[in-house]
Amino acid sequence: TVEGRDKDGNPTGGWDLQEIRTAQDFYIKYGLNAVKGVSEVASIGGFVKEYQIDVNPDALKAYNISLMQVMTAVQKSNKDVGAKTIEINQAEYLVRGLGYVKKVEDIELAVVAVKDNVPIRVKDIGVVALGPETRRGILDKGGAEAVGGVVIARYGSNPLEVINGVKSKISEIASGLPKKTLANGVVSQLTIIPFYDRTELIQETIGTLETALSHEVLISIIVV
C-alpha cells in the first residue's frame, strides 16, 4: 500500500485517495514495471482522476451542436501536432504544437464549432471539472480505504528474484515520491508499505523441499 509517513516512519494522514492513486498510477507503477521479470503492476483502490464535462442540453440545442461534435473537439484538443521544420539563418528547427491538456481551462477553451465567425467553446455549452472515475472495487486495510498495487511476476520467471528486484526498486524510487507539509507543520511523504510479501512463504517452501529431499536420500542410502 501507499501511505503518508513522517521522517520517522509514523503514519501522518493528510493525503486524499485521489492524490495517492495518482502517484501510484503515474510514478510507482511505471517504476516497478521496469523490474526484470515483472509482468504487470495492477493498481487497486483510491480514485482515478479524470476530466468530467457536464453538457447543457439546452445549450447544445440552441447552438445546433451534437454530442459527437463535443467529443470530437475534446479529443482533438488533447494531442501534440508536428509541423515539420522551418529554416532560419541556415539553421533548421523542428516545429511542434504542444496541445496536451494540463488543466480544466484547456478543455474549457476547446473550440467545438464556429457560428457566424464566433467560436463556440466547451465552456459555452457545459461545465468542466475534475472528478473521480467510476469505481468497481476498493482496497481495505484495517477497516479503512487504502491505495496499493499488486505486482505480478512474468510466467516462467524466478519469483524470489522478482521480489528482490521489486524491493530494490522500491528503495530506489522511495526518495522521489511526493511529499508535502501538513497543517500541523509535519512533512509527510508517500511511502510504499509492504502489504503481502511471498518471500517468507517461498523460503519455507524451499526449506521444506530441502528437508524432504535430504530425508529421501538418507532413506535410499539406508535401504541400499
Question: Predicted segments — roles?
Answer:
Residues 1-8, 48-136, 168:
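Helix/segment boundary signal
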Residues 1-77, 185-187, 199, 204, ...:
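A structural signal for conserved, well-ordered secondary-structure elements
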Residues 13, 17, 21-25, 63, ...:
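Solvent-exposed, acidic/flexible segments
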Residues 26, 30-38, 73-80, 110-113, ...:
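Conserved, well-folded catalytic cores of nucleic-acid-processing
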Residues 30-47, 72-93, 116, 124, ...:
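Short beta-strand elements
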Residues 34-35, 47-48, 66-68, 77-80, ...:
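Glycine-rich loops and low-complexity Gly/Arg-rich segments
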Residues 139-224:
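Hydrophobic regular secondary-structure detector
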